[in-house]
Amino acid sequence: MKITELNYTLPTDLIAQKPLSERDKSRLLVLHKNTGEIEHRIFYEIVEYLNEGDILIINNTKVIPARLIAEKPSGGKIEILLIKEKKCSSQNVVWEVMTKGSYEGEVFIDEFIAELRNNCDGRYIVFKNMTSPKVRNLINEKGFMPLPPYIKRKPIQSDRQDYQTVYAKMNGSIAAPTAGLHFTKELLETIISKGVKLREITLHVGVGTFKPIKVDKLQEHKMDPEYFEIDKTLIEEIYAIKKAGKRIFSVGTTTTRALEGYASGKYEDRGSDNYKIKGSTDIFIYPEFSFKIVDALITNFHLPKSTPLAMVYAFCEMQKVKKAYREAIEKGYRFFSYGDAMLII
């Protein structure tokens, strides 16, 4: 499949720059994958599509305020996006980072001294004379939420709440699992009261999710691995539920990557125990992939030429998805992280 199939034209005024004041009042495009039928609903009406005995699986990862503003000795500012902690010692803590430019040398973050370095496998910041907990405190106090570049404004204090799901609890992501942003606690309670089983997994969203595809053939794209955890009892429950004819609703492409990465054996074990599967997956889901767990997908509208859009094409016939996107654009849906949602069922 050629990368051009993932391209489409989006008016810039449809890129949501801020969230709605009420999470569950966003619009919901329902796409029936067998027939191609499209419905236009409000997100809180999603409860009508869930039946007693179905499982709704959410990603409980929490976004860290991973964007830091540092100062060079010259007084110039440099913006740093923290990717993940690589190692720490009694004196130094090292994080993988992304920045504009290739500056190497000392930087100052508040009263703390750090050093930016390049090597053959990436770009790093070394926090000197600091422990890992102290660095994490610095991030929480001085960091900004890592809003995507298509949001053309500076992060504000309210983004710390808005760019976070109401059920986020496991620190580790540098981007939100955006499909989950539409749920309120009240909506989840309503869903549970209907007899739907709410279950959690963790997948820490990293560069792998939003890294652009730069090859012409999708098959040649390589995903960066992302860490996940799944309770072993959930896997048993999933297979029992599916055998009973009930459905698995996955909230977002990140939840889906964890579930299908595990089910496909496309993961590297990271210390699984008697209770949890712990691993990292670099699975890339694109058309012709055979889904083993997920029956219904809740997701946002994705960027052109992106890996999440490739997953959506894999989950539902490409031409049906393209038609749904065209209709969403015609009807003025809001796109991307703070935008509206789709249910593919």
UniProtKB/Swiss-Prot annotation:
Subcellular location: Cytoplasm
GO terms assigned for molecular function: S-adenosylmethionine:tRNA ribosyltransferase-isomerase activity
InterPro entries reported for this sequence: QueA, QueA_dom1, QueA_dom2, QueA_sf
Highest rank taxon of the organism: Bacteria
Any GO BP annotation: queuosine biosynthetic process
EC number: 2.4.99.17
Alphabetic keyword roster: Cytoplasm, Queuosine biosynthesis, S-adenosyl-L-methionine, Transferase
GO CC annotation terms, alphabetical: cytoplasm
Assembly and binders: Monomer.
Protein name: S-adenosylmethionine:tRNA ribosyltransferase-isomerase
Organism, as annotated: Thermodesulfovibrio yellowstonii (strain ATCC 51303 / DSM 11347 / YP87)
Gene name of the record: queA
